[in-house]
Amino acid sequence: MQESQTKSMFVSRALEKILADKEVKRPQHSQLRRACQVALDEIKAELEKQRLGAAAPPKANFIEADKYFLPFELACQSKSPRVVSTSLDCLQKLIAYGHITGNAPDSGAPGKRLIDRIVETVCNCFQGPQTDEGVQLQIIKALLTAVTSPHIEIHEGTILQTVRTCYNIYLASKNLINQTTAKATLTQMLNVIFTRMENQVLQEARELEKPIQSKPQSPVIQATAGSPKFSRLKQSQAQSKPTTPEKTELPNGDHARSSLGKVNSENGEAHRERGSSISGRAEPSGGSDNGAQEVVKDILEDVVTSAVKEAAEKQGLPEPDQAPGVPECQECTVPPAVDENSQTNGIADDRQSLSSADNLEPDAQGHPVAARFSHILQKDAFLVFRSLCKLSMKPLGEGPPDPKSHELRSKVVSLQLLLSVLQNAGPVFRSHEMFVTAIKQYLCVALSKNGVSSVPDVFELSLAIFLTLLSNFKMHLKMQIEVFFKEIFLNILETSTSSFEHRWMVIQTLTRICADAQCVVDIYVNYDCDLNAANIFERLVNDLSKIAQGRSGHELGMTPLQELSLRKKGLECLVSILKCMVEWSKDLYVNPNHQATLGQERLPDQEMGDGKGLDMARRCSVTSVESTVSSGTQTAIPDDPEQFEVIKQQKEIIEHGIELFNKKPKRGIQFLQEQGMLGAAVEDIAQFLHQEERLDSTQVGEFLGDSTRFNKEVMYAYVDQLDFCEKEFVSALRTFLEGFRLPGEAQKIDRLMEKFAARYIECNQGQTLFASADTAYVLAYSIIMLTTDLHSPQVKNKMTKEQYIKMNRGINDSKDLPEEYLSSIYEEIEGKKIAMKETKEHTMATKSTKQNVASEKQRRLLYNVEMEQMAKTAKALMEAVSHAKAPFTSATHLDHVRPMFKLVWTPLLAAYSIGLQNCDDTEVASLCLEGIRCAVRIACIFGMQLERDAYVQALARFSLLTASSSITEMKQKNIDTIKTLITVAHTDGNYLGNSWHEILKCISQLELAQLIGTGVKTRYLSGSGREREGSLKGHSLAGEEFMGLGLGNLVSGGVDKRQMASFQESVGETSSQSVVVAVDRIFTGSTRLDGNAIVDFVRWLCAVSMDELASPHHPRMFSLQKIVEISYYNMNRIRLQWSRIWHVIGDHFNKVGCNPNEDVAIFAVDSLRQLSMKFLEKGELANFRFQKDFLRPFEHIMKKNRSPTIRDMVIRCIAQMVSSQAANIRSGWKNIFAVFHQAASDHDGNIVELAFQTTGHIVSTIFQHHFPAAIDSFQDAVKCLSEFACNAAFPDTSMEAIRLIRFCGKYVSERPRVLQEYTSDDMNVAPGDRVWVRGWFPILFELSCIINRCKLDVRTRGLTVMFEIMKSYGHTFAKHWWQDLFRIVFRIFDNMKLPEQQSEKSEWMTTTCNHALYAICDVFTQFYEALHEVLLSDVFAQLQWCVKQDNEQLARSGTNCLENLVISNGEKFSPAVWDETCNCMLDIFRTTIPHVLLTWRPAGMEEEVSDRHLDVDLDRQSLSSIDRNASERGQSQLSNPTDDSWKGAPYANQKLLASLLIKCVVQLELIQTIDNIVFYPATSKKEDAEHMVAAQQDTLDADIHIETENQGMYKFMSSQHLFKLLDCLQESHSFSKAFNSNYEQRTVLWRAGFKGKSKPNLLKQETSSLACCLRILFRMYVDENRRDSWGEIQQRLLTVCSEALAYFITVNSESHREAWTSLLLLLLTKTLKINDEKFKAHASVYYPYLCEMMQFDLIPELRAVLRKFFLRIGLVYKIWVPEEPSQVPAASTAW
């Protein structure tokens, strides 16, 4: 009721107002008046009925509405502005408040609804520019209300009409307010149309969800069309821009939105009051800009937007394809064509009317695409969008564009509206196939045209639209985007004639693109890694790099300021690209300082408080990673970085092959075939020539025309792959010649045309025009000639049609072709020449014309030509790809960044380097440095060493700290470079590797620069021995000072005060607190570097330190100090890492500690001491070796540095460690003893004394308490003591050292368990042997070393201690230990093998060896049970060796020891041992018989014989050193030759004769030894004396007791053993007997000096050997235990005795016979003592010899015994029988 009254009030007031208007009273408006009156009457009647309470139902709505509408329609058709305004205002209100819905059918137009008529009526009120301005505004209001009202629905043509009308008002209206309002209304309308479409799908999705889900869901969050959820761009990005007379900038991230802005819909239901509020403000308020803006603002604030619903978030939507249709319009197709002219009342010459009739372009197959929509709203949106695209494509008029022209304004506003639509595009628009197709077919083609517009506004808008497409639609527009980049953007950047404005706008756009990580990576992945696409990313970076490097602004028609601005933008883009890469790969980055992104890591004075950095950059980017919305229409390729890298490599190969082909086709083909990119078959090559567009068409033509067989085959295959079926001849020829340029040579053309003709006839065999292929061939040739003739500028007289026909007479098998056919060919060629494929020459030519541009005007002309060409190419390409579907990969993998960076790092580096080098602009420098930082980060993350090093070196170079240029040239950019370098070190330390070298070098030089800059003198540099007072006075002093600082490479020679002041000022900033802290932070932050990085860091810090210390006069210790600091900082790292660090640092300390500059070395040693003390405090677990590694530098310094000061300091440092940290030292003991070992051999008494004191303290005291910890170094301790003992300069120390070694034995003895339980590196040592290996062996070994190395008194002491230890502790030794031990002991005798001075060697043998031999025998005897099995043979071998030496004393000792050994232990010998013993003796006997004595001749006398014997002898024994000490041969039976007697003898003779003499001595000694062994202690001398006494007393009783004694080894030896000894004795006797009988030889020897005053003889040997032999035999002969051997014994006795007696008879010399006296006494006495039976056997043999003896003058004793013998013979043979004892005659003294 109320509603009806309100409606009536509106209507009646409006009708009354119309009637009241004086214009209506005119006759022509009678129909209007009547209609108004009828309507008023009806309203009154209706109100009356309602007042009376009539309940009759109202009439049908449509009749009522019809009635009400007619007067308004008539009013709108009237020419009166006031009437029209009133009518429109009422209509607007009725629609706004829902009083008119217009759903009823239109009675006047079948198939239409009333609302369509209403809208048409409103639209028709606009009659062009002359329409009243108030009416225009009312039209706009009414139309906006109609579109936005929730109560009515308008679609298709009607909605297009509303948009068109507003569009026309915008163009035609002269009122600025109306223009602006119309434009704002258009924006709002589009917003509503597209938002409704989006909401409708959302609503359907919600409706579907309701029945499915049982549980109620939380309400779907709605958002306005302007919501960021739908708009992929942030609020701050490009929006629709105002059309104002002023030039506007390209919108970018920082650009403020225009006052129109993006019209956001209001939430909630429409408030109906708003409709009325508009009317109150409808009147124009003035023409000023401000007024216009204000009114627009008011209107827009109150526009009814109730229809706009919030769109749900993207995530809640189903895929567009799956959204179900609604009953309204299941499949709405595009409506049929309508003649628009009948509907358009727009400007006559501006037909921008919107047609709903344009169907989509046919697809590639020529079939029209059915435009299928799931809802009418989608169709509305599609029609509006398509119309706007077509409007934007309309060409501008000729001549320079007029900003006020309808054409230009139309183009601009259409582009602005398109931009608005795209920016607000929702999920449906972005994914529905119809819209994507529309974008491809209409918008992209439109952009290709507008994208090269010379009008800045158009160009700028095109760029903004492209940006939006790239953001939201790149998944669908892969090929279109490629065309944009390749043909437009990059061409504009590369073309030298481009205007600054165009370049600037392109680069602004690129700035936005380059700021989006997803976009940048996607470009690389989809184009550079696609075999069929251009290398967009690479080309983009190269172009930007060239711009960033800057070129001559004059060349490009730019001012220097413009050129700098462009350069900065270029750099900004390059930096953005790298930032994107950094952001993309940030998950791989590990920041040692736990900061999130590179952006945060600034120097302290630059740090950002809110930690934005790259995140901020990301927010400002064109699109986030979410920007790629996949759709059902597109199948994306899976993102596999490795696969893309393979493709990229293949692409590079193909590109290189094409490059080669374009120079030399055969080489290119060969290369591609070798690389497997091209098949070997001619068909493959032909296909390649067809498909590869990058091939040079001229080269392709030359290749195909070549006469070689291979080329012909390729050409045939090439032509055969063309399909000419059902093609006109000229069309076929055009197709054929599109692929290449005909070669210039006639023969080549001939071959090509011939094959073409054959192929054409083959494809068109049914044709009847050509008689044969020859006809086609000739005709083709004639067409080529005709094209040249008609279209070549060189040909002046063009061929006529008649001439052409005449020329082709008779070519068809002697007949003519039809004239009309040839005529049509002529006309076609005349109209359009046969265009052969263009090469790149055209584009290259335009790019290279920059040198030829004479003026700005010429440049603009050239540019316009190029832009036209560009537009033409781009449009053609865009149309070509409009139907193509190329899969787009949305990159997700981090690994893409590595190949991306590898591709572009060089142009990037060039740009940054040149920027830093040539430009002092701080912004340029800042960008370059930021770029380098990002580049270093990427190279670091992906381990690209070459690239990383290149960038870091660039930074180092521009810091001027390492450059050869003068540091006085330092500017702000160089200071910033230093700061950047420090930041890189701080943030990327984990990855820097070898690049640390450059950084640390710079930091070192920075410290040096700071010293100069702050005026510090050389005295502050450690190591300089001089000081200077006062400030710098003049450059001479300054130069000297700097040279003193080692600044030859930093400060150029003549530095005046002014330069110095300037330098100090610039360097002053590097000394600022922030820089100092930042540098320090690198070192303190080293603790956060990872295990590998810290090693690299330390390694290069050490290298820089070495460089600092290399200055001979003024070494610096900055880096060395830092090494010490970082050692402190990093000491708590895990041991594995620390040991790797210390391996480097320790090696450095080794070198520094040996630095020739003592101050440096002292600093190093002291630092080492401090570090060591701290390190030792941490202690060490068992079996670790960290201390050992840590303390090793002390050892090295001690070994290599000969400076007493340093050596003394090292000893004191170690002593301090021992005294304070003994309890914590474990493996470090090794180093400590190694240091003392070095000190032990020093000649400086103080050093030796100090070291020995500490060593003594360790051994005697510390070992007591910490022996288990020192076990591993026990051997080193003993070795160290040994070294002290061997220092001959300090005998007291030596003796004390030996005492301490003896003391060490006590530790081993007392703590065997500790040694047994200790496990370490030698785990292969059995637990039972550890006491030996770790304890006894080192002690005994070192004692043997002392014995071998020291002087007599020390070695004697060492020998004594060694054998004392053996005797004291030997009972604990295992058998195999003894073997090791005796190997050590026998080393004592090895000394003789060394060629030393004869006197020393002699002394050695006489003393030490002697001593050792006896000691060995003592030990062996003491531990015989343990030793005999394992060592007896070794001992015998050693004794044998001694006996064989050319040292009489040693030989005697050897035999003595052998004797002692056997006598002491013989009773324990087993038969086997006796066997070994006897064999040993036999061997000694035989090897020491001096056979050479019998044959030797001096030189010249039978030299050959002599030499032969000598050689034999030398092979068996050592004759290397001859002992000529006469005193040692004093006991020889041979006379000692005087010194004079040897003088004349050659040296070789002397050696030989001395050796022989010793052998004679040994023989005698051996005989005595056997005698002693067998009969000890009954010596032969005693027995001989007793025999003599007995003979004198003439009785045999005297020696009876000897016979009964049972001493010596006789009873322990078997007969066979004794027989062996007898063999020895007999051999010796035989030899000496032979020698003594050889008078001639004895004379030769005597003359040679072998004997002094008398001839040499061997009487003693001759007699003693026989005597011993006889004693043994007679002892055995009477031994009852050997009865079984008596026969052999008797035989031996008889032989020996008879030979002896026979020999005696032959002796002539009296003295010789005298020597035999005791021998004969022995023989006869012993024979007399045997029993009668045995005596008989002997007497019968001896009798004749004894008779012969009677003739000699014998001594009385011998005669007495002989007498007894004969008497006995008489008795035994019973020659006489004594009656009484007295009858035996007394010995005759006279005989």
Swiss-Prot record:
Inhibited by brefeldin A. Residues 2-224 are annotated as: DCB. Its main location: cytoplasm. It comes from the Eukaryota. The modification N-acetylmethionine is found at residue 1. The modification Phosphoserine is found at residues 214, 218, 227, 277, 355-356, 621, 624, 707, 1518, 1520-1521, 1532, 1535, 1541, 1788. Residues 214-225, 233-243 have a biased composition (Polar residues). One of its GO terms (biological process) is protein transport. Keywords: Acetylation, Cell projection, Cytoplasm, Cytoplasmic vesicle, Cytoskeleton, Disease variant, Endosome, Golgi apparatus, Guanine-nucleotide releasing factor, Membrane, Phosphoprotein, Protein transport, Synapse, Transport. In vitro phosphorylated by PKA reducing its GEF activity and dephosphorylated by phosphatase PP1. The modification Phosphothreonine is found at residues 244, 623, 633. Pfam families: BIG2_C (PF20252), DCB (PF16213), Sec7 (PF01369), Sec7-like_HDS (PF09324), Sec7-like_HUS (PF12783). Residues 208-292, 311-350 are annotated as: Disordered. Residues 661-792 form the SEC7 domain. This is Brefeldin A-inhibited guanine nucleotide-exchange protein 2. It comes from Rattus norvegicus. The lineage of its organism: Eukaryota, Metazoa, Chordata, Craniata, Vertebrata.
